[in-house]
Amino acid sequence: MAEISTARGSLVAIVTPMSDDGALDLGALRRLIDWHIEQGTDGIVIVGTTGESPTVNFDEHCLLIRTAVEQAGGRVPVIAGTGANSTSEAIALTECARAAGAQAGLSVVPYYNKPTQEGLYQHYRKIAEAVDLPLILYNVPGRTVADLANDTAVRLAEVPGIVGLKDATGNMERAADLVRRVPKGFALYSGDDASALPFMLLGGHGVISVTANVAPRLMHEMCVAAFEGNLARARECNDALLPLHSKLFVEANPIPVKWACAELGLIPPGLRLPLTPLSGGQHEVVRAAMRHAELI
């Protein structure tokens, strides 16, 4: 089991900038990565759910990974979303990430086809055996239906090349069980912003964050405070962020967070169908959460 010791803290699940017609805006992506690094973001997670991975094609997916790795230039780790509900496609995307120079692949639990726990084990083991790139598992049953059980995750933690897990269940009992059972050095990341602070206090390595798209400095400072045991500062940051954690999900992610990024002038407002722009009635809801965090 390899170790990604550098990928610790606030890792942004970065949005994919697009023009009004849905074309990729690579220039905006490069500027966005520079801004995140300036703001203290500890790592870039490219082409995940928040990056609209379901609606980019294979060539675009690889192009986005290459662009992120090139722009980051080794300043922060780049973790590439490489998951698919086809094992062969997941292998191909992971190989693309390896060739681009990403530090790791983030592979979501296969969605729609509802594999068994043994199927999940074989899927991930096959990817790890096929590609020489550290692999982080990603469990988000609210989207995938299939749920990677802790027993299966612990079993996979022993497979060479599988180095971590993003847990988006928000279940602290499950998180505590994982922290207790996985090998030392196996990286555990919260995939749920609202419970990221308790997750880290239990022993997690950080958060792969939607909220960090608009509040990177606060998310970074919260992580630093948590790791240093400065609970007063960690709570202060978390209190400022809490409305964002909920209001950035008033419609399906990444609809609200892309609107918020555009509101801050970071990106153009484009999305790809079937995602549509944030409903007008939700604009002030998200804006109020941004004001609470003193972003505007």
Curated annotation (Swiss-Prot):
Subunit-level organization: Homotetramer; dimer of dimers.
Which pathway is this protein assigned to? Amino-acid biosynthesis; L-lysine biosynthesis via DAP pathway; (S)-tetrahydrodipicolinate from L-aspartate: step 3/4
BP terms from Gene Ontology = diaminopimelate biosynthetic process; lysine biosynthetic process via diaminopimelate
Cystine pairs: none
Please state what the protein is called. Answer: 4-hydroxy-tetrahydrodipicolinate synthase
Per the UniProt entry, the Enzyme Commission number(s) are: 4.3.3.7
Part of a proton relay during catalysis, annotated site positions? T49, Y112
List the active-site residues.
Y138 (proton donor/acceptor), K166 (schiff-base intermediate with substrate)
Catalytic reaction(s) noted:
L-aspartate 4-semialdehyde + pyruvate = (2S,4S)-4-hydroxy-2,3,4,5-tetrahydrodipicolinate + H2O + H(+)
**Protein localization:** Cytoplasm
Q: What does this protein do?
A: Catalyzes the condensation of (S)-aspartate-beta-semialdehyde [(S)-ASA] and pyruvate to 4-hydroxy-tetrahydrodipicolinate (HTPA).
One GO term in the molecular function aspect is: 4-hydroxy-tetrahydrodipicolinate synthase activity
Give the main location.
Answer: cytoplasm
Native organism: Thiobacillus denitrificans (strain ATCC 25259 / T1)
A single cellular component GO annotation: cytosol
Q: Which residues form a coiled coil?
A: none
Q: Looking at the keywords, is Isomerase present? A: no
Q: Which family does it belong to?
A: Belongs to the DapA family.
Protein residues bound to pyruvate: T50, I208
What UniProt keywords are attached to this protein's entry?
A: Amino-acid biosynthesis, Cytoplasm, Diaminopimelate biosynthesis, Lyase, Lysine biosynthesis, Schiff base
